[in-house]
C-alpha cells in the first residue's frame, strides 16, 4: 500500500506529524507538504514561478507552493509509482459545510481525486491540537477501513473529528455538507505607516446544522464522514436553462 500524505498547515505542523505516525505501519508513506501555512488556499496552483522541493531532517519533502501544488508535483514529478491512496491533514480546525470550498486540506485531497486516486481529508474541529492523538487514531481507523474494503469509485472523503478524547467519540456518521451563515465583516486596521489594511473576518456560524449534516454530527460528538464530488454542474437546471437560452442560441 503506497500512501501520499500532504496538508495545508505546512510540513512542520503537528497534525501532519501525528497523521504520518498513525499511518506509518500501514504502507509505504511519502510526505509532500507546503513549506508554510496555506490555509484557505483552496485549489490554487502556482503558475507564475517555478516550484522548489526540499527535504526536511525527518524525511518529509516540502514545496514552496500550495497544497494543490504539493500533490500535483508529487503525482507528476516526484513519485515513480502511483499511490494507492492520498490523505491530507490533520488540519488545525474544522472544514465543515462551505469551508470545503476554501480549504487547502480538502484541495490537496481533491487534486488526487482528479487523478483518479482515492483521497481523504482529515480535520480536527477545534484549533489548538488538544486531542490530536485521538484524531490520529480515528484517522487510522478510517484508512484501515479503506485499505480493507476500498470504495468502488475513487473516493473523495471529507472527515471532521470532534476535539475530544477517543473514548468519548460517538462513532462515525455519514453526512452531507451543512451550510454556514455569511462570514463576519472584514476587520479594518491601520499600519504604522498610515495605510489602511483589511483582515478577512471570522467564518459565519452554522446556518444548516440539521440532522444529517456534518455540523450536526460534530455537535453530537460524532466523527463526520462526507463524500464529496467535483462536478459542479447543476443538472436540475439544465432543462430550464436550455429554454431560457433558446433565443440566444438561435440569434446570438
From Swiss-Prot:
Pfam families reported for this sequence: SurE
Chief subcellular location: cytoplasm
Keywords on record: Cytoplasm, Hydrolase, Metal-binding, Nucleotide-binding
Names of the cofactor(s): a divalent metal cation
UniProt cross-references to InterPro entries, sorted A to Z: SurE, SurE-like_Pase/nucleotidase, SurE-like_sf
Top-rank taxon: Bacteria
Residues that hold a divalent metal cation according to the record: 8-9, 39, 91
Cofactor note: Binds 1 divalent metal cation per subunit.
Function according to Swiss-Prot or TrEMBL: Nucleotidase that shows phosphatase activity on nucleoside 5'-monophosphates.
Protein name (record): 5'-nucleotidase SurE
Organism per entry: Bordetella avium (strain 197N)
Amino acid at each position: 500500500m503506497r500512501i501520499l500524505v500532504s496538508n495545508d498547515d505546512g510540513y512542520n505542523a503537528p497534525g501532519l506529524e501525528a497523521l504520518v505516525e498513525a499511518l506509518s505501519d500501514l504502507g509505504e508513506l511519502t510526505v509532500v507538504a507546503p513549506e508554510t501555512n496555506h490555509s484557505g488556499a483552496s485549489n490554487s496552483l502556482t503558475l507564475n514561478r517555478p516550484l522548489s522541493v526540499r527535504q526536511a531532517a525527518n524525511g518529509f519533502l516540502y514545496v514552496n507552493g500550495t497544497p494543490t501544488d504539493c500533490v500535483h508535483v508529487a503525482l507528476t514529478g516526484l513519485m515513480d509509482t502511483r499511490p494507492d491512496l492520498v490523505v491530507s491533514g490533520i488540519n488545525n480546525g474544522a472544514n465543515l459545510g462551505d469551508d470545503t470550498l476554501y480549504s487547502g486540506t480538502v484541495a490537496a485531497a481533491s487534486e488526487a481525486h482528479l487523478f483518479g486516486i482515492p483521497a481523504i481529508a482529515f480535520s480536527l474541529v477545534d484549533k489548538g491540537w488538544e486531542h490530536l492523538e485521538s484524531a490520529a487514531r480515528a484517522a487510522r481507523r478510517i484508512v484501515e477501513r479503506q485499505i480493507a474494503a476500498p470504495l468502488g469509485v475513487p473516493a473523495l472523503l471529507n472527515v471532521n473529528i470532534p476535539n475530544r478524547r477517543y473514548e468519548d467519540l460517538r462513532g462515525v456518521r455519514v453526512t452531507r455538507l451543512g451550510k454556514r451563515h455569511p462570514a463576519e465583516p472584514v476587520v479594518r486596521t491601520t499600519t504604522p505607516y498610515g495605510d489602511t489594511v483589511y483582515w478577512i473576518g471570522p467564518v459565519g456560524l452554522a446556518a444548516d446544522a440539521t440532522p444529517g449534516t456534518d455540523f450536526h454530527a460534530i455537535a453530537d460528538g460524532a466523527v463526520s464522514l462526507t463524500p464529496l464530488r467535483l462536478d459542479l454542474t447543476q443538472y436540475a437546471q439544465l432543462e430550464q436553462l436550455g429554454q431560457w437560452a433558446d433565443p440566444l442560441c438561435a440569434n446570438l
